[in-house]
Amino acid sequence: MAEKFIKHTGLVVPLDAANVDTDAIIPKQFLQKVTRTGFGAHLFNDWRFLDEKGQQPNPDFVLNFPQYQGASILLARENFGCGSSREHAPWALTDYGFKVVIAPSFADIFYGNSFNNQLLPVKLSDAEVDELFALVQANPGIHFDVDLEAQEVKAGEKTYRFTIDAFRRHCMMNGLDSIGLTLQHDDAIASYEEKQPAFMR
């Protein structure tokens, strides 16, 4: 069972770029592993580092700014997670420490993969995201409160409402991924299998 997501308060980092694709999130040369850990070191590798080996940080990239170290909420622009359908993208984001991504829109496959990996993708309007960028840029180090149960983001003096599909919301709040959902019916599955002829087992 995955970690339950109900509420999260975290430091916000503003990535002011639209159409951030999955190859930018986790470049293809780092996709050899099939486990979910270790990808955070290569998150935004071509932007975070000046060298291919990822040993020389790029001082001009926002994730490297001192005031955003330890950020767990990523604020982005429209069509986040576009490009190829690699599940490694949410793996890299969560392994780095992100719990929430806020953007006006997400690529469909990335959006679904995020829920499967307990990464909450929050959709707000363009105008609301503009407000949040202005707020973060005026208050570096600001924290947002994200409440999945209430479907609200509290930022500064304002509260922003978002909507999540009821089934996905239930799964995240109960720490259920695809395997967890199946295991909820373990007794019924076992009972069904016991009733099958021996040659079908």
Swiss-Prot record:
Domain of life: Bacteria
Cellular component annotations (GO), alphabetically ordered: 3-isopropylmalate dehydratase complex
Keyword Lyase: yes
SUPFAM superfamilies recorded: LeuD/IlvD-like
Broad enzyme group: lyase
Enzyme Commission number(s) from the entry: 4.2.1.33
Pathway linked to the protein: Amino-acid biosynthesis; L-leucine biosynthesis; L-leucine from 3-methyl-2-oxobutanoate: step 2/4
Family annotation (InterPro entries): 3-IsopropMal_deHydase_ssu, Aconitase/3IPM_dehydase_swvl, AconitaseA/IPMdHydase_ssu_swvl, IPMI_Swivel, LeuD
A GO BP entry: L-leucine biosynthetic process
Signal sequence segment: none
Catalysed conversion reaction: (2R,3S)-3-isopropylmalate = (2S)-2-isopropylmalate
GO molecular function: 3-isopropylmalate dehydratase activity
UniProt KW keywords: Amino-acid biosynthesis, Branched-chain amino acid biosynthesis, Leucine biosynthesis, Lyase
Function field: Catalyzes the isomerization between 2-isopropylmalate and 3-isopropylmalate, via the formation of 2-isopropylmaleate.
Family: Belongs to the LeuD family. LeuD type 1 subfamily.
Subunit structure: Heterodimer of LeuC and LeuD.
HAMAP family: LeuD_type1
UniProt name for this protein: 3-isopropylmalate dehydratase small subunit
Classification lineage: Bacteria, Pseudomonadati, Pseudomonadota, Gammaproteobacteria, Enterobacterales
Gene: leuD
